[in-house]
């Protein structure tokens, strides 16, 4: 998911995406540990997606705090 696509989401949708991505990452790591994971690059992709989601969420927090001051 691109940062531009993430910015189009609402804050609650971003939080939901973070939650589902973390669950997916957990499952991928479990598959890796048991030797069932074939596409190991997927772990990296999911981690980067989580980082993008958290970055946009933090940007919104900062904007909101500046608006309140």
UniProtKB/Swiss-Prot annotation:
MF terms in GO: structural constituent of ribosome
InterPro entries: Ribosomal_protein_uL29, Ribosomal_uL29, Ribosomal_uL29_sf
Transmembrane segments: none
Gene3D superfamilies: 1.10.287.310
Signal peptide: none
Keywords from the UniProt entry: Ribonucleoprotein, Ribosomal protein
GO biological process entries: translation
Entry annotated with the keyword Lipoprotein: no
GO cellular component terms attached to this protein's record: cytosolic large ribosomal subunit
Similarity field: Belongs to the universal ribosomal protein uL29 family.
Entries under PANTHER family matching the protein: 60S RIBOSOMAL PROTEIN L35/50S RIBOSOMAL PROTEIN L29, LARGE RIBOSOMAL SUBUNIT PROTEIN UL29C
HAMAP family from the UniProt entry: Ribosomal_uL29 (MF_00374)
UniProt name for this protein: Large ribosomal subunit protein uL29
